[in-house]
């Protein structure tokens, strides 16, 4: 059986799309090996049929400290990849892929790059000259060098299996309530609105906000969101609101006190193990704008207010969110310019005008791609045909 190596690490945003691709490749009969770093160890599930290897590669701002670590990782990668004897290596960007990708080039193994963001990252840009193909998630991607444009193939983002198993959601302004559409119904009625309501949304008087900050940057949300909700409830005191929010244990006590005084129903977690459960009940999401988050929300058509993480590499989260906002598929509020008052006004505007949610859901679904299938096809066409 032919072997394929996936290389991704750093955050769940890189890790989970790579796993989704690996699962599809296994279904097609390939043996999939996955090289990642120690930070992603917590995401590895023993039930996965992928063979994992962990590299100890830390990120240093000082290049003199980083180079010795990189050299050790490079030598380990050469030894590992040589013994695996892979036909191709797929890199998902980020500094943890540097050593394995250099090793692949040294061993003359073909490489394919997947860029999840709307802005080609530094690592992927560097390896673009060596890649057979560059798979992208956004048609109007930025920062692609001229020499690499002929290698570009639009495959779309890659979404986890448990998210793909959710039905798409579309918003009915007349009912003020999300309605669940199967893929078949969605295809046949994209320009019409179904009247049937899903039982999970039978209580349409309650508006559910789902708030999460990902593995980075949830602290701001623990301070900004409660202040915004206080303002919102003063402006709309009769609003029936439910909040599902990611927050550290240290912040939960203070936030619970605020929400309790406002008579708001709430749920908290430090980390959502199966985020699909929260997506299923949300009317509106407030989140960061990491690539995998955006792809998941796009796949199910769930409207979102994005607050990009300003410290994200190459400011890619801003470009991701801005692209959706420009296409009326979401809302982008920059952290440096945001205030509790502005966020409260934005939430109130959307609650008061459900047509905006409905339109955003439609526009999200229009951008939906089956990235795990398209990238698998690209790999087979590029390397095995």
Curated annotation (Swiss-Prot):
UDP-N-acetyl-alpha-D-glucosamine binds at residues 11-13, 117, 160, 215, 317. The lineage of its organism: Bacteria, Pseudomonadati, Pseudomonadota, Alphaproteobacteria, Rickettsiales. GO terms for molecular function: UDP-N-acetyl-D-glucosamine:N-acetylmuramoyl-L-alanyl-D-glutamyl-meso-2,6-diaminopimelyl-D-alanyl-D-alanine-diphosphoundecaprenol 4-beta-N-acetylglucosaminlytransferase activity; undecaprenyldiphospho-muramoylpentapeptide beta-N-acetylglucosaminyltransferase activity. GO terms for biological process: carbohydrate metabolic process; cell division; cell wall organization; lipid glycosylation; peptidoglycan biosynthetic process; regulation of cell shape. It is a peripheral membrane protein. Keywords: Cell cycle, Cell division, Cell inner membrane, Cell membrane, Cell shape, Cell wall biogenesis/degradation, Glycosyltransferase, Membrane, Peptidoglycan synthesis, Transferase. Its EC number is 2.4.1.227. Coiled coil: none annotated. SUPFAM superfamilies: UDP-Glycosyltransferase/glycogen phosphorylase. The gene is murG. It is found in: Cell inner membrane. Disulfide bonds: none annotated. This is UDP-N-acetylglucosamine--N-acetylmuramyl-(pentapeptide) pyrophosphoryl-undecaprenol N-acetylglucosamine transferase. Pathway: Cell wall biogenesis; peptidoglycan biosynthesis. GO terms for cellular component: plasma membrane. Cell wall formation. Catalyzes the transfer of a GlcNAc subunit on undecaprenyl-pyrophosphoryl-MurNAc-pentapeptide (lipid intermediate I) to form undecaprenyl-pyrophosphoryl-MurNAc-(pentapeptide)GlcNAc (lipid intermediate II). Belongs to the glycosyltransferase 28 family. MurG subfamily. Pfam families: Glyco_tran_28_C (PF04101), Glyco_transf_28 (PF03033). It catalyses: di-trans,octa-cis-undecaprenyl diphospho-N-acetyl-alpha-D-muramoyl-L-alanyl-D-glutamyl-meso-2,6-diaminopimeloyl-D-alanyl-D-alanine + UDP-N-acetyl-alpha-D-glucosamine = di-trans,octa-cis-undecaprenyl diphospho-[N-acetyl-alpha-D-glucosaminyl-(1->4)]-N-acetyl-alpha-D-muramoyl-L-alanyl-D-glutamyl-meso-2,6-diaminopimeloyl-D-alanyl-D-alanine + UDP + H(+).
């Amino acid at each position: 059986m032919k072997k394929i190596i996936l290389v991704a690490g750093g955050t769940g945003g890189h890790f989970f799309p790579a796993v989704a691709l690996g699962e599809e490749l296994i279904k097609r009969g390939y043996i999939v090996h996955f090289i990642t770093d120690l930070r992603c160890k917590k995401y590895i599930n023993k039930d996965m049929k992928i063979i994992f290897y962990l590299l100890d590669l830390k990120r240093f701002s000082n290049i003199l400290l980083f180079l010795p670590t990189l050299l050790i990782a490079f030598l380990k990668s050469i030894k590992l990849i040589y013994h695996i004897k892979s036909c191709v290596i797929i890199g998902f960007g980020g500094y943890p892929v540097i050593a394995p990708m250099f090793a692949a080039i040294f061993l003359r193994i073909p490489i394919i790059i997947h860029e999840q963001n709307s802005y080609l990252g530094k690592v992927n840009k560097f390896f673009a000259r060596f890649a057979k193909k560059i798979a992208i998630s956004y048609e109007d991607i930025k920062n692609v060098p001229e020499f690499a444009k002929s290698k570009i193939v639009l495959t779309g983002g890659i979404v986890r299996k448990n998210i793909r198993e959710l039905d798409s959601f579309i918003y009915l302004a007349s009912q003020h309530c999300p309605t669940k559409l199967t893929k078949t119904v969605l295809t046949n009625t994209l320009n019409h609105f179904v009247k049937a309501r899903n039982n999970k949304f039978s209580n349409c008087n309650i508006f559910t906000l789902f708030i999460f900050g990902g593995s980075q940057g949830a602290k701001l949300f623990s301070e900004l969101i409660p202040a915004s909700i206080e303002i919102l409830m003063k402006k709309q005191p009769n609003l029936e609101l439910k909040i599902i929010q990611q927050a550290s244990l240290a912040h939960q006590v203070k936030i619970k006190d605020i929400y309790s005084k406002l008579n708001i129903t709430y749920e908290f977690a430090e980390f959502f193990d199966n985020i699909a459960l929260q997506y299923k009940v949300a009317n509106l999401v407030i989140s960061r704008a990491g690539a995998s988050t955006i792809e998941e929300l796009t796949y199910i058509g769930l409207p979102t207010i994005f607050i990009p993480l300003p410290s994200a590499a190459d400011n890619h989260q801003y470009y991701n969110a801005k692209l959706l906002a420009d296409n009326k598929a979401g809302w982008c509020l920059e952290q440096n310019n945001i205030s509790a008052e502005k966020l409260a006004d934005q939430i109130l505007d959307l609650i008061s005008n459900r047509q905006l949610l409905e339109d955003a859901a439609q526009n999200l679904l229009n951008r939906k791609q089956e990235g795990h299938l398209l990238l698998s096809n690209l790999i087979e066409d590029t390397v095995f045909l």
